From Swiss-Prot:
A molecular function GO annotation: transmembrane transporter activity
Annotated Gene Ontology cellular component terms: plasma membrane
Source organism of this protein record: Sodalis glossinidius (strain morsitans)
Taxon lineage: Bacteria, Pseudomonadati, Pseudomonadota, Gammaproteobacteria, Enterobacterales
Family: Belongs to the major facilitator superfamily. DHA1 family. MdtH (TC 2.A.1.2.21) subfamily.
Designated name of the protein: Multidrug resistance protein MdtH
Main location: membrane
Cellular localization per UniProt: Cell inner membrane
Tagged with keyword Transit peptide: no
Length: 405
């Protein structure tokens, strides 16, 4: 095995270990925020939605700057600093008793993610070949599902005692992740050239096709982020106890571990990436329409399972499409900007979802937010269809963008 191949092989094991710590640290805390502040403390869902949307918008919206810094400075210092900043945000969240404190803690957590997320994503592109990238994304997503359940179970158990313990556990996991990166991550350059930071950002903004694709995904993310806000609230309403939320993540893990990789392997041989993304989005939006009408917990979990199946179909294709369109001369900047759709979708999805939930309760129309989310998904589907019909997306190795290391 050549030294380059060995480095790629070891690097992928490192990425999996790092991803485990990050996902567990995140899911210990964030799925329980709406339960803690809306159900236990009685805050308006809009206030909590603003906090979650702020976190999403700052982390993903400023990702292009984090990516540009990583292109210039390398991945390691950005990742370590970002993980420590997120740990600090979690500590502050544990003592939040006013909305502004929750917003500040979410902002700190988001700034940490702005620093570590783009270089981590760029490392995946650097350490995988184009033809194996889709399968590696599937493995990461399977791991995400398993670790999210472990994190949510740990957080739910700790919430029975004190929310401060929930936040402390998340902070400790991110400190461990920072130490792990400081100890084992080499000083990789994540782009093929070391250009000025503004050059990488300009290169992204001039790429009209990439920009259009990223912004079109805003509606997709408005649906996907509801696993952190609206779905836990709805489960708690139907079940009457917050502990039932953990079963949502158990369903996700069971479906992902059993279906994600086989579906990815089967579909990549038969369907284009664009088709897989649109098919998954179709399943997601159809599953959301009736949720507000369901009062039986088993039926609700069946719809949530259908939503996750749609995500299982769509997510590997979405990630691979984004990587295929990225210019390797500015990997960090491209991966940072690719999160802008998530920033906008998260901010609108969280705050808008919380607002629609409050309005629906006030008007006694509980299905209002779910109908609107389904409609947004349908509009997004039409936008993607039109974009892909005009010009199908080809893998990066075929469209003239070299695969430098």
């Amino acid at each position: 095995m050549s030294s380059v191949s060995q480095a790629r092989s070891l690097g992928k094991y490192f990425l999996l270990m790092d991803n485990m710590l990050v996902v567990m640290g995140f899911y210990v805390v964030f799925p329980l925020i709406s339960i803690r502040f809306v159900d236990q403390l009685g805050w308006a869902a809009l206030l909590v939605g603003i906090a979650l949307g702020l976190r999403q918008f700052i982390q993903q919206g400023l990702g292009i700057f984090g990516g540009a810094f990583a292109d210039r400075l390398g991945a390691k210092p950005m990742i370590i600093a970002g993980m420590l900043m997120r740990a600090l945000g979690f500590v502050l969240m544990g003592i939040a008793d006013e909305p502004w404190l929750l917003w500040l803690s979410c902002a700190l957590s988001a700034l940490g993610g702005t620093l570590f997320d783009p270089p981590r994503t760029a490392l995946v592109i650097k350490l995988t070949r184009p033809w194996e990238r889709g399968r590696f994304y599937s493995l990461l997503m399977m791991q995400d599902s398993a670790c999210s359940v472990i994190g949510a179970l740990l957080g739910s158990w700790l919430l029975r005692y004190d929310f401060k313990l929930v936040c402390l556990a998340g902070a400790v996991l991110f400190v461990f992740a920072a130490i792990f990166n400081a100890w084992l991550l080499p000083g990789y350059r994540i782009s093929t050239v070391r250009a000025p930071m503004l050059e990488g950002m300009r290169r992204v903004l001039r790429d009209q096709r990439f920009v259009t694709y990223v912004l079109t995904l805003t509606g997709y993310y408005m649906l996907s982020v509801q696993v952190m806000l609206m779905l836990p609230i709805r489960i708690n309403e139907v079940a009457g106890q917050p502990a039932a939320v953990k079963w949502m993540y158990a369903i996700e893990a069971a479906l992902s571990l059993s279906l994600l990789y086989p579906i990815a392997r089967w579909s990549e041989k038969r369907f284009r990436l664009e088709t897989r993304l649109m098919a998954g989005l179709t399943v997601m939006l159809l599953s959301l329409f009736p949720i507000g009408l369901i009062e039986d917990l088993r039926a609700l979990f069946m719809l949530i399972g259908l939503f996750y199946i749609g995500s299982i179909i769509a997510e590997p294709a979405r990630e691979t499409l984004g990587a295929s369109l990225a210019d390797n001369r500015a990997r960090g900047s491209y991966m940072g900007f690719s999160r802008l759709g998530l920033a906008l979708g998260g901010a609108i999805g969280y705050s808008g979802g919380g607002w629609l939930y409050d309005v629906g309760n006030r008007l006694e129309i509980p299905q209002l937010p779910w109908f609107m989310l389904g409609l947004i998904g349908f509009i997004t589907l039409l936008g993607l269809y039109r974009q892909f019909q005009q010009r199908p997306i080809e893998p990066a190795m075929l469209n003239g963008r070299g695969e430098g290391s």
